[in-house]
């Protein structure tokens, strides 16, 4: 019996919608990252993007435990000397709530071209409205 290797053109991708309201950030991000990679499928192949599309709504209502709401810091660097910028979780969730979930999921995906392709299948929205009703997403309860 030969080992099965999925081919990118034969992978069937479904659309799922996740409501992040009241859910813990890390627990929801691990499940999303796993679904984006396709690890829930029998035909999972590590070097092929076999994952599904994930829509996350209500990103502004995600929950964090402990003192992370005030103490967690996100860093970015412009590439120039002295170009490091820092922003706390509570300020970032008010300014760009989508970035909180995107940063958590992106850190759990592979680094490189395959990880970037997986990350592009993640759609995050701050509120309850999204622009993907035509894809008829299935509700994913996490």
Swiss-Prot record:
Q: Does the keyword Cytoplasm apply?
A: no
Q: Which GO terms describe its biological process?
A: negative regulation of translation; translation
Keyword check for Transcription: no
Q: Which GO terms describe its cellular component?
A: cytosolic large ribosomal subunit
On the tree of life, the source organism's domain of life is Bacteria
Disulfide bond sites: none
> Which molecular function terms from Gene Ontology are attached?
mRNA binding; structural constituent of ribosome
Q: Which Pfam families match?
A: Ribosomal_L13 (PF00572)
Sorted UniProt keywords? Ribonucleoprotein, Ribosomal protein
Name the protein family. Belongs to the universal ribosomal protein uL13 family.
- Subunit organization: Part of the 50S ribosomal subunit.
Q: Sum up the protein's function in the record's words.
A: This protein is one of the early assembly proteins of the 50S ribosomal subunit, although it is not seen to bind rRNA by itself. It is important during the early stages of 50S assembly.
Identification of the protein by name? Large ribosomal subunit protein uL13
Q: Which gene encodes it?
A: rplM
